[in-house]
């Protein structure tokens, strides 16, 4: 049994149908005897939509608040994917970053610094 980490970008989870397809892939991996951790991005277009909202309010606003707003896209996707897995009989639970203990060995510069 292996621990498999799968990462899906916005296009891969961009519609309910694509989220269902990701759920099927996860289940196949679990059925092969693996433990699976899934990391997902916001659905396609959501991050750009939120950046537009941020810029409409205050483009120079707090980096912390921008991060809070932008993280909501991933929260929606993880909830939807967990629901899709559960609807197919697969035990699943969504977590946001603060709920899991991850040790960062390296952090790259913020995209805002580029």
Q: At which residue positions do the language-model features occur?
A:
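Nucleotide/pyrophosphate-binding catalytic subdomain
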Residues: 1-108, 112-114
